[in-house]
Structure formats: C-alpha cells, structure tokens
C-alpha cells in the first residue's frame, strides 16, 4: 500500500496563545483563500444584468452626485483638481476601506453554518474579503487612470510619480485597518446582534469625518480640523491623493498616529479573534 507523502495533516488543539494567528496554517490553506475570493466576487454580481460593470457605473454615478451636491451646491473646493477625478480617486480608496470593514463585520455570523461543519483557519475568510475588496479597487482604479491620463495630457493634473511607490503600502495599510475593525465588530455581534444594524450607518458617518468629499487643506485651523487629522483613515486618503493626483496634505504626526492606531487595533483584533473563534459557534 502506498502512502501519500504530501498529505497535509491538521492537528486541532486548544490554543492559549492570544497573539498566535497560525500563519503557517493559513499559508497551507492559501488555495482556500483564493477560492473564497473568487466565490465572494462571483456572488456579488450573480443574477445581475451588467455584472462587474457596476464597478465602473456605481463610483461614476456616485461621483456625479458628489459634484452636484458638494461641488455645485455646497461649493466645496477640490484643491484645484478636476472634480470628477478628485471624487473618483477619493471614493475608490474609501470604498476599499468600507468594504473591508463591512464585509468582515459579519465574519462569524455570516459564516456560522460553514464554520460549524468543517475545520479550516477562520482567518482565511477575512483575508479573502480584503483580497476581494482590492480586486474591486483595482477595477475601479482602471477607470480613474484613464481619466487621469486625459488630465495629465491637458496639464490639469501633475501626479507625484515617485510617491506611487507608496500606493501598495497604502492599500495594505487601509485594507488592514478595515479588516481589523471588521473583525472586532464581528466578534462583538456574536452576542450583540444590534451592532450589525449600526455598522452601515456608522461607516456612512465615518466617511463625512474623513476628507473624502473635501480636501483637508480647505478646513480652517481649529478643533474640527484636528479631529479630522486624528481620524486614522484621513492620513492614507490624503497621502493617496498626494501621490495619484499631486495634491494632498501630508501631516507627519497624523500619519504616525494612524500607523500606530492600525498596529494597536491589529493586536486587539488578534486577541479578540482568537478568543471568540473558540466559542462563538455556541452563541451564534
């Protein structure tokens, strides 16, 4: 009888290491992450007429609404940038964060049936949600790049090309922050279902406390501007616009604060995730 030397054996035991993410195990299940990513992307546009075209239509129509409401009616400045480009780029990165947060906010409650049937590293689900959000972001950004090329040719926009090297780090930064917040919320919703109702409302409010529809440079000095700068999502949004569009306010202490906040929330998310994944199936 021949034995399969490449067969993977998974040993399941009680873990008492609060900061152990079992990343080696997650790596062994990387094919499952790819499968979850494909499934999530496919399900999003299943039984729709236009399918993934909504990734172009939705942000474009949203930007048109922003132009009418915030540009023409509220007369908010876009830092001298073309309005359509300002809103499209800002909304693309914000959508990456909000999708990572909202999709991961239902990690435990939305996958309870699957988690209860078979064992696999639970972390594969939130990671796949981030990958799905990044794919959506990439598709939307292809439209932004076409419009950006037009305005670069006309001389209306001059990107800071060297800062484009930071874009992958910005995506990891804001994707990780969204995933961490989502995991913490998901852990809490296993006992308090009311929180799931408040997530979309809270994310909407959070957007207006973030320089998405307005540039940070247009805010007057004072408490309001300081609060916006403390917002951990503000720094990556402004840094992203500075790189891609050539206009953005870089506040070093705000960047450091946001990076530190992301690290601390990440540690908290690990502890909460490891604690809840052991017993959540009995409470969901």
What is each model feature region?
Residues 1-284:
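Hydrophobic transmembrane alpha-helices and immediately adjacent juxtamembrane helices
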């Amino acid at each position: 009888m021949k034995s399969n030397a490449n067969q993977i054996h998974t040993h399941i035991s009680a873990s008492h290491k609060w900061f152990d993410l079992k990343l080696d195990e997650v790596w062994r299940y990387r094919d499952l992450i790819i499968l979850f990513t494909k499934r999530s992307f496919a399900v999003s546009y299943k039984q729709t007429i236009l399918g993934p075209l909504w990734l172009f239509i939705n942000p474009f129509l949203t930007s048109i609404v922003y132009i009418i409401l915030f540009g023409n009616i509220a007369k908010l400045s876009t830092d001298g940038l073309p309005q359509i480009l300002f809103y499209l780029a800002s909304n693309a990165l914000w959508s990456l964060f909000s999708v990572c947060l909202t999709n991961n906010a239902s990690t435990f409650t939305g996958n309870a049936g699957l988690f209860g049937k078979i064992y696999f590293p639970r972390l594969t689900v939130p990671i796949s949600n981030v990958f799905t959000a990044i794919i959506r972001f990439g598709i939307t950004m292809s439209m932004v790049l076409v419009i950006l090329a037009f305005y670069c040719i006309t001389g209306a926009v001059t990107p800071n090309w060297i800062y484009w090297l930071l874009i992958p780090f910005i995506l990891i930064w804001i994707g990780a922050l969204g995933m961490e917040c989502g995991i913490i919320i998901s852990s809490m919703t296993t006992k308090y279902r009311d929180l799931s109702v408040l997530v979309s409302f809270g994310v909407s409010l959070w957007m207006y406390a973030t320089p998405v529809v307005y540039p940070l440079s247009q805010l007057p000095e004072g408490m309001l501007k300081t609060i916006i700068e403390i917002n951990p999502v503000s720094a990556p949004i402004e840094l992203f616009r500075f790189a891609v569009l050539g206009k953005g306010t870089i506040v070093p202490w705000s960047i450091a604060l946001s990076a530190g906040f992301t690290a601390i929330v990440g540690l908290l998310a690990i502890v909460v995730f490891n604690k809840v994944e052991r017993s959540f199936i009995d409470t969901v």
